[in-house]
């Protein structure tokens, strides 16, 4: 029963305890530094600590129990490191999780189907045209006032430090506008802290926004009771007019959480495409050969306890039309302007 920021400390300690569990697991089970040993180590790490195995089996039919035998057939004692990497990365790719990666000196194993398999619904050239050349910059926020007195803010990342002062300056500058467009397209995440600081500017009351759970054992269903997550209204300037938040499939991780937190705010409309998802808080471990593996460790849900791992639907579905693109028009921005000017 606390806000997201105050729960971060608990999360950190939870992850510290979680890391100790992983460490003790590795000490108990030693794997050889050969192709079979590295595959078995990777399979075991995911089997005991990845948080979406049952959900992925239910939704996309991934049965992790059969993956070890399936991919062991592709191993040989004479295979190169590059060949071993391809096999291990392919096994991880079955999970279809952008937070699951295999890191080696020569490559990063990944599955980016959460946005690569869908229309982009975004044009950097068009966004640059709407921003013009005289826009202002406050940390990761680019902003200006459009000719119809609509504020336009681009937030392309939560990886750059974003402070309360930055956000207050932006909202103060745009305070005379009739409405606000917050363009989150292509924002693939970063810090949950920065995402929450921005979300707090769109609520005037404490709101339940979701839940988080933690692994408590090695079983696929071994989780703690879900803990509620809240956002508190900011003590700084809060936006008191209508706002449209633009999304596409590249909205991932912390941005997915941001959309969860602001969707349902009385004055906020989410417009665009379903987000890419990525609701598991990531954690890292290591294989016998030194390669690092990242995976989702703690599942997060929305306020109705729905999974958001595969993304969040917008309030208004909207796609960038090729006809508009050819004419130098961003369909989503224009639809947002029309809505805000009604």
Predicted regions and their residues:
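Bacterial Sec-dependent N-terminal signal peptides
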Residues: 1-32
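A generic structural signal for short, non-catalytic loop/turn and secondary-structure boundary residues
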Residues: 2-3, 15, 136, 146, ...
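Polar/charged alpha-helical tracts
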Residues: 6, 69, 124, 128, ...
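Acidic-histidine catalytic/liganding microenvironments
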Residues: 7, 177, 265
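Generic anion/oxyanion-binding catalytic loop in active/binding sites
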Residues: 14, 73, 325
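Alpha-helix termination/capping residues and helix-transition junctions
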Residues: 19, 174-176, 237
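Flexible, low-complexity junctional segments that flank or bridge functional domains
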Residues: 25-214, 220-228, 242, 284, ...
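C-terminal "post-core" interaction segments
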Residues: 26-47, 82, 150, 188-342
């Amino acid at each position: 029963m606390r806000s997201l920021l105050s729960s971060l400390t608990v999360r950190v300690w939870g992850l510290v305890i979680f890391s100790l569990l992983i460490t003790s697991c590795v000490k108990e089970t030693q794997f050889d530094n050969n192709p079979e040993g590295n595959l078995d180590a990777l399979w075991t790490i995911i089997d005991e600590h990845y948080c979406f195995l049952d959900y992925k089996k239910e939704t996309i039919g991934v049965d992790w129990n059969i993956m070890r035998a399936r991919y062991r057939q592709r191993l040989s004692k004479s295979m190169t490191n590059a060949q071993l990497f391809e096999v291990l990365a392919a096994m991880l790719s079955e999970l279809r999780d952008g937070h699951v990666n295999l890191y080696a000196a020569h490559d990063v194993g990944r599955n980016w189907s959460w946005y690569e398999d869908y229309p982009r619904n975004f044009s950097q050239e068009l966004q640059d045209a709407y921003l013009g050349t005289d826009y202002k910059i406050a940390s990761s926020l680019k902003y200006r006032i459009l000719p119809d007195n609509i504020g336009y803010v681009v937030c392309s990342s939560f990886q750059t430090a974003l402070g309360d002062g930055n956000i207050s300056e932006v909202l103060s500058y745009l305070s005379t506008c009739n409405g606000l467009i917050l363009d989150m397209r292509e924002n693939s995440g970063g810090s949950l802290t920065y995402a929450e600081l921005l979300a707090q500017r769109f609520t005037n009351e404490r709101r339940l926004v979701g839940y988080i759970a933690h692994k408590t054992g090695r079983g696929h269903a071994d989780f703690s009771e879900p803990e509620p997550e809240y956002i508190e209204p900011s003590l700084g300037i809060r936006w008191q007019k209508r706002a449209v938040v633009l999304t596409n499939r590249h909205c991932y991780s912390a941005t997915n959480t941001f959309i969860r937190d602001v969707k349902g705010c009385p004055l906020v409309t989410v417009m665009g495409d379903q987000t890419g998802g990525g609701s598991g808080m990531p954690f890292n471990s290591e294989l016998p050969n030194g390669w690092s593996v990242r995976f989702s460790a703690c599942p997060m849900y929305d306020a109705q306890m729905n999974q958001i791992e595969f993304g969040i639907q917008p309030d208004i579905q909207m796609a960038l039309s090729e006809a508009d693109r050819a004419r130098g028009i961003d369909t989503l921005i224009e639809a947002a302007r029309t809505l805000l000017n009604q």
